[in-house]
Regions:
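Conserved PLP-binding catalytic core of the aspartate aminotransferase-like
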Residues: 297-306, 311-346, 356, 360-361, ...
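Short loop-beta-helix segment that forms the pyridoxal 5′-phosphate
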Residues: 78-84, 93-116
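Conserved PLP-anchoring active-site segment centered on the Schiff-base-forming lysine
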Residues: 117-136
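Active-site phosphate-binding strand-loop segment of PLP-dependent enzymes
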Residues: 150, 154-206
Length: 395
């Protein structure tokens, strides 16, 4: 039997390779940080979600070791059997305190949080209205739910309003959006979304994965940026980006919503609890962020420094409020060649092109971190400038 599907898979894989879409893993032989080791050489890392530079933070590493010593290596159980330790509850409270919400539920990943949030809450008589550029995990979560589905053009409030008008016959309506869209780096217009939600009696859900730790005066995310703390019904997020970069996701928001997810959210009910090391480090991470805004302030300064340098060099940079800087190249092959040449120059980035982004919108996505020094940012800008001139992207 396998011989038949083997031939089919080999053909599909060959087509993926021929189209230049085959994904290869680039092996790192160092901790995740601003400068990493790849293929036996050191390179500057500008493609990680390590926004606050915490992935190799000594304080978090020590907290993880301490939690493992005191609470063990793993839980070997789901939460509602014997997989809930006191530190899991402590981390859930820390998340709620950070975002100004009523309660929190932890997941193995934010993919699980987004995948498990809709089906327990909404049914055939309800409507889910989702931004067209939402993350794949939201798309998959919506597919698992029987609610009527609407999709509006990215951050297009006129289109969103039309969807809300069409959904008025449904029992409940919920608007779902990424806080920051990962390919362009643009932030959702949450103030306008909330205004429309109030006008048309809809709930609001925001995925804070790329906005938490980044947006807002103190980095508390998009709800802080738009002065909507405690007003958004559902927030999802991850410990795998700004918050240390390990694993783990969460949903935080209205108390009754979180309670229902504990009863019926399948990824929560049928997945092991987060391991103590991750939980202990997460608690310490939120403690650090409560003590000081230094890392967030450094990130904001680094993003501004990098964007100004790149625009001065003549590059086309997408407008952004986040730590994601999309350097537009438009041509797919050029984006691949540019990324390869940058690695030769000691800068580790990735070129993105169709179907990850629309045709003719190829780019290199640069992700700035609080862990980058000014010298490292300048070296990155210099490398971009050198390669940009070689490939006739800039003069």
């Amino acid at each position: 039997m396998y011989g038949k599907i083997k031939e089919h898979l080999q053909q599909e894989l060959a087509e993926i390779k021929a189209a230049g879409l085959y994904k290869s893993e680039r092996v790192i032989t160092s901790p995740q940080r601003a400068e990493i080791e790849v293929a036996g050489r050191k390179v500057l890392n500008f493609c990680a979600n390590n926004y606050l530079g915490l992935s190799d933070n000594p304080r978090l590493i020590e907290a993880a070791k301490k939690a493992m010593d005191n609470r063990g290596y793993g839980m070997s159980s789901v939460r509602f059997l014997c997989g809930c330790q006191d530190i899991h509850k402590e981390l859930e409270k820390a998340v709620a305190d950070y975002f100004g919400t009523e309660d929190t539920i932890l997941y193995a990943a934010c993919f699980d949080a987004n995948g498990g949030v809709f089906e327990p809450l909404f049914g055939e008589q309800d409507a889910i209205i989702s931004d067209a550029l939402n993350h794949a995990s939201i798309i998959d979560g919506v597919r698992l739910c029987k609610a009527v589905r609407y999709r509006y053009a990215n951050a297009d409030m006129a289109d969103l309003e039309e969807c809300l008008k069409k959904a008025q016959a449904q029992r409940f309506r919920i608007i779902c959006t990424d806080g920051v869209f990962s390919m362009d780096g643009n932030a959702a217009p949450l103030d306008e979304i909330c205004a429309l939600a109030e006008k048309y009696d809809a709930l609001v859900m925001v995925d804070e994965c790329h906005s938490a730790g980044v947006l807002g005066k103190t980095g508390r995310g998009i709800t802080e940026l738009y002065d909507r703390r405690g007003q958004v019904d559902i927030l999802t997020g991850t410990l795998g980006k700004a918050f240390g970069g390990a694993v783990g996701g969460f949903t935080t928001g209205r108390r009754e919503i979180i309670d229902m997810l504990r009863q019926r959210s399948r990824p929560y009910l049928f997945s092991n609890s987060l391991p103590p090391a991750v939980v202990g480090a997460g608690i310490e991470m939120f403690r650090m962020l409560a003590e000081s805004n230094e890392l967030h302030d450094r990130l904001v300064a680094n993003v501004e420094h990098f964007r100004e340098g790149m625009m001065a060099a003549g590059f086309d940079i997408k407008p952004t409020q986040s730590a994601i800087c999309a350097v537009m190249l438009y041509d797919a092959k050029l984006s691949q060649d540019f990324a390869a040449r940058l690695q030769d120059e000691g800068v580790f980035v990735t070129g993105f092109y169709y179907p990850v982004v629309p045709k003719g919108q190829a780019r290199i996505r640069v992700q700035v971190s609080a862990g980058h020094t000014t010298d490292q940012l300048d070296r990155c800008i210099a490398a971009f400038t050198k390669v940009g001139k070689e490939l006739n992207v800039i003069k």
